[in-house]
């Protein structure tokens, strides 16, 4: 291992620029030494491999073998590195200050580091126990200064290392040889430029290291199995003030008072303790802590709380996305894979479903075939053979002519119409011939019947035309035929009277339809009642229009003077209807003798 460290420090490029096989051999030598150290030492975990195989393997395969070894012993190695950090740094600083370029000093330092590492491995178990005891004994306030002390010690070590570098750079300047390249002048010095760049890099590394010091990469990783300490309200806020208890005059048992105080204290603590880092989704669980307060609610308030929960649940279900089967027509890309297997689909089958072939079906078919062969029952359809191949098909073939028609479309329609009329005329002639044939046959049958039985066959009824003259009813009263009904001798209103029903329970409407009162609807009854009222009101209404006209005439005449109204009898009256007396004296005409 020390040889590998020496080669890496002296000339690391020699290893990197080697062949892959040579590099793998160097890695094999280092990892084999680590495995032997783990076997000989008192490490709790042992390596899974005894040695690393390099022959015939590439770098990736060799790396995975190394990873298996390091993963099995990484815990002890990291613990050893953390313990040796303070030991290796001062020794390294001293060696750099004394002899930086001497390989013997480096080898001695590495050997010392290895020996110290082995001793630390031997005492790893004891150190872990001591650390656990110290961690348990220390409080949270004591842990913070320890972290600060570690930071300050690390910063001091880095500053010392930087000073030693400056000293070594000064010594290098004293023993520096003249410019080998010949590029130095009074304005530019190559050695000074290199020193400045190294100093700038060191300052950058120091600043980055100070930022990385906040994170301790060698501390123990927190395990998930360890229970996290609960954070309560008391850790951040003061305890609530207790109300002074009033002293009652009645003397009570001190034990009962203590029990009551404990119960009150427990209930108050349950109310105060809250999980400050709980999510919003855990709010119902946080409310469960205060279930004791629900006991103080009335039955109506509890019922309202349950109703609100149900309403909230229903609203969430209504707003939530519906299932694909409730969205109507869904294509295959819009539904999950194999979703139809769990659904019961209803659709119309256009064809007869194919029967499922089972062992029972096949056995029954085989038995039926054997039985029919034994019985020679071959009732299959006979195969049809066409003997006359030259026979033409019954359907006439349509031939479309390529010659342009000489007739117009109107002429073609006209020919079709006349052809249909000719066919109808032919059918009428054929019908006349059929009627003549049937008449001749009927005469023949009658003659044959007469010859067979003259006494029992009546004469055939001959069709005769009867002409009736519609004469008035008065002229037919004297000579009325006996076979005619009395309806022809009645007046039309006697036969059919609109609005008058034949029975008491019927009503005849204006259109002549007779309906029973029970068949009338409420609207029909109301309509008939309103019509009857209008009819009665018209009958009882006096002749207002005529009187109004007469009054208008009288009013116009009354405005004039010396108006006399003479009626049909020759009486003279004034406009108001009073008889008008003559004011003249006695005359020869009106003197009584």
UniProtKB/Swiss-Prot annotation:
Residues 148-177, 186-195, 236-255, 266-276 have a biased composition (Basic and acidic residues). The keyword Ribonucleoprotein applies. The keyword Nucleus applies. Keywords: Acetylation, Nucleus, Phosphoprotein, Ribonucleoprotein, Ribosome biogenesis, rRNA processing. Pfam families: Mpp10 (PF04006). Residues 90-297, 564-593 are annotated as: Disordered. Residues 128-147, 202-232, 256-265 have a biased composition (Acidic residues). GO terms for cellular component: 90S preribosome; Mpp10 complex; nucleolus; nucleoplasm; nucleus; small-subunit processome; sno(s)RNA-containing ribonucleoprotein complex. Its main location: nucleus. InterPro entries: Mpp10. It is found in: Nucleus, Nucleolus. It comes from the Eukaryota. The modification N-acetylserine is found at residue 2. The modification Phosphotyrosine is found at residue 181. The modification Phosphoserine is found at residues 176-177. One of its GO terms (molecular function) is identical protein binding. One of its GO terms (biological process) is endonucleolytic cleavage in 5'-ETS of tricistronic rRNA transcript (SSU-rRNA, 5.8S rRNA, LSU-rRNA). Belongs to the MPP10 family. PANTHER family: U3 SMALL NUCLEOLAR RIBONUCLEOPROTEIN PROTEIN MPP10. Component of a heterotrimeric complex containing IMP3, IMP4 and MPP10. Interacts with snoRNA U3. Component of the ribosomal small subunit (SSU) processome composed of at least 40 protein subunits and snoRNA U3. Interacts with the SSU processome subunits EMG1, IMP3, IMP4, KRR1, NOC4/UTP19, NOP1, RPS4A, RPS4B, RPS6A, RPS6B, RPS7A, RPS7B, RPS9A, RPS9B, RPS14A, RPS14B, UTP1-UTP18, UTP20-UTP22 and UTP25. Involved in nucleolar processing of pre-18S ribosomal RNA. Required for the early cleavages at sites A0, A1 and A2 during 18S ribosomal pre-RNA processing. This is U3 small nucleolar RNA-associated protein MPP10. It comes from Saccharomyces cerevisiae (strain ATCC 204508 / S288c). The gene is MPP10.
């Amino acid at each position: 291992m020390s040889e590998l460290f020496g080669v890496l420090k002296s000339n690391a490029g020699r290893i990197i620029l080697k062949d892959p096989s040579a590099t793998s051999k160097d890695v094999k030598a280092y990892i084999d030494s680590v495995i032997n150290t783990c076997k000989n030492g008192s490490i709790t975990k042992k390596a899974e491999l005894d040695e690393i195989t390099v022959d015939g393997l590439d770098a990736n395969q060799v790396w995975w073998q190394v990873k298996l070894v390091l993963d099995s012993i990484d815990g002890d190695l990291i613990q050893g590195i953390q313990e040796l950090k303070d030991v290796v740094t001062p020794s390294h600083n001293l060696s750099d200050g004394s002899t930086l370029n001497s390989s013997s000093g480096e080898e001695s330092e590495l050997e010392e580091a290895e020996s110290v590492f082995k001793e630390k491995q031997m005492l790893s178990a004891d150190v872990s126990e001591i650390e656990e005891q110290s961690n348990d004994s220390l409080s949270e306030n004591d842990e913070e200064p320890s972290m600060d002390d570690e930071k300050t010690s690390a910063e001091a070590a880095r500053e010392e290392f930087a000073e030693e570098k400056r000293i070594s750079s000064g010594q290098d300047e004293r023993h520096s040889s003249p410019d080998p390249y010949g590029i130095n002048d009074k304005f530019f010095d190559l050695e000074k430029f290199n020193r400045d760049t190294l100093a700038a890099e060191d300052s950058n590394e120091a600043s980055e290291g100070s930022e990385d010091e906040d994170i301790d990469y060698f501390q123990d990783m927190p395990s998930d199995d360890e229970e996290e300490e609960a954070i309560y309200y008391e850790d951040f806020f003061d305890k609530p003030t207790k109300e002074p208890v009033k002293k009652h005059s009645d003397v009570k048992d001190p034990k009962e008072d203590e029990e009551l105080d404990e119960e009150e204290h427990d209930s108050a603590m349950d109310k105060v303790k809250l999980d400050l880092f709980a999510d919003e989704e855990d709010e119902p669980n946080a409310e469960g802590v205060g279930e004791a307060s629900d006991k103080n609610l009335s039955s109506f308030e509890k019922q309202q709380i349950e109703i609100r929960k149900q309403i909230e649940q229903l609203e969430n279900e209504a707003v939530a996305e519906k299932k694909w089967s409730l969205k109507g027509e869904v294509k295959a890309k819009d539904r999950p894979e194999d979703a139809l297997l769990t659904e019961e689909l209803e659709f119309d089958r256009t064809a007869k479903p194919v029967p499922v072939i089972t062992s029972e079906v096949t056995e029954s078919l085989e038995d039926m075939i054997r039985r029919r062969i034994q019985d020679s029952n071959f009732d299959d359809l006979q195969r049809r053979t066409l003997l006359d191949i030259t026979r033409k098909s019954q359907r006439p073939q349509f031939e479309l002519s390529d010659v342009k028609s000489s007739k117009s479309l109107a002429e073609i329609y006209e020919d079709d119409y006349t052809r249909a009329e000719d066919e109808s005329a032919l059918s009428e002639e054929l019908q006349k011939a059929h009627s003549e044939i049937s008449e001749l046959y009927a005469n023949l049958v009658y003659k044959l019947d007469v010859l067979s039985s003259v006494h029992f066959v009546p004469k055939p009824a001959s069709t005769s035309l009867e002409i009736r003259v519609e004469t008035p009813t008065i002229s037919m009263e004297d000579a009325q035929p006996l076979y005619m009904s009395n309806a022809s001798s009645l007046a039309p209103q006697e036969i059919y009277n609109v609005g008058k029903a034949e029975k008491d329970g019927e009503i005849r409407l204006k259109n002549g339809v007779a309906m029973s009162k029970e068949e009338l609807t409420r609207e029909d009854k109301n309509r008939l009642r309103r019509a009857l009222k209008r009819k009665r009101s018209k009958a009882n209404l006096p002749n207002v229009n005529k009187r109004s006209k007469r009054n208008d005439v009288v009013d116009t005449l009354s405005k004039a003077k010396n108006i006399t109204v003479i009626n049909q009898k020759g009486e003279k009256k004034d406009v108001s209807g009073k008889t008008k007396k003559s004011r003249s004296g006695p005359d020869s005409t009106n003197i009584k003798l």
